[in-house]
Amino acid sequence: MTTPPANHAALLARRARVLAPTYQLFYEQPLQIVRAEDVWMYDESGRRYLDAYNNVPVVGHCHPQVVEALARQARTVNTHTRYLAEQPLQLAEELLATLPPELGSAIFTCTGSEANDLAVRISKAVTGGSGFIVTEFAYHGATDVIAGMSPEDGNPLGPGVYTVPPPLGAAGDGDFGAQVGACLERMRADGVRLAAMLVDTIFASDGVVPEPRGFLADAVRRVHEAGGLFIADEVQPGFGRLGEAMWGFQRHGVVPDLVTTGKPMGNGHPIAAVAGRAGVFAEFARGRRYFNTYGGNSVSCAAALAVLQVIRAENLLANAQRSGEYLRRGLRELALRHTAIREVRGAGLFIGVELGANSASGLGGAAETRRIVNAMCRRGVLVGSTGRNANVLKIRPPLTLEPQHADLLLDALDQSLQSRV
């Protein structure tokens, strides 16, 4: 293991002194990142790292068009939605143009957590229900209400929150619709009225489950028949990450009642949204209002608008599809040589690599995955981990990733699997 830079001890001491212990750092040897560009992040020594993990900079770190849009608007005016302004209207129009026509309105927030919190509030008001269905290892955000719907973090479930097992994928024998149906029966037996089913459409925290395509449809049908709404959490899979479509729910042939977005929407600038059916919003607005001081502010909207424009202009959905297929093919070739790789799953540039026991390291499951994440970091490639058993490598690079970058990732993973450290 390399020796950490001398200044890290001082930074860690300052951090421990002034930041609450709820904060966590990535990697056994934390990185000090001082600048970034496209798919690269640079530490204080100038060493570069391939960022294959942070799905926030969806069009690449510090994209010049996004930076210029931010700066130009910040030099002009930054205000909120209680004044007439062009920026939130243009952003809403362009965002809604990427969604099914049934989803005709949007509300802006600052984070995906806020967006999910608002979607939950809307669903309660519209349905009169208080029950929610999420998957067993879901993560949907950090507000008090949404933390109670995010069992990944070990949070206790909130009142009226029920869980279902995640879909098992093409290789499994699970029927997600049947699981949701059984959950609805439990809720009825408990006298709980359904408000909504909230799912991340790539099931990222459950281990990345994109297949079989269409498995959500039966579950959504059952939810609607029970009088509930379907909330598609697109904070992680949205904005073209899955390649073939802008949004994860589109791969399943369903139209949500509410769609939430977040992380990549501003390419690092805090902006998020809830899009929904006109009737749902109209019912919510009856006797209620929602205002968020920074949700829909001029500068954030300028950044998000630039992100949408870059995705179109640079044809990033097609690149995510092409580079994602290249990377998954390379990962499956590695699996033929490394028995530690159990399965490669994914769509576009959202990929999960499930790991098991590795004879080279003598480790298995979560311990091996943790070792691989840190070994790849030492080799200049950043990935993360996810899943109920913490044994799935999570790969989410900017949509600008090219095959030559994928080759660097594949080489780092190959070397890490062969090593003992």
Q: Which stretches of residues belong to each language-model region?
A:
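Conserved N-terminal phosphate-binding loop of PLP-dependent enzymes in the Aspartate aminotransferase
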Residues: 1-421
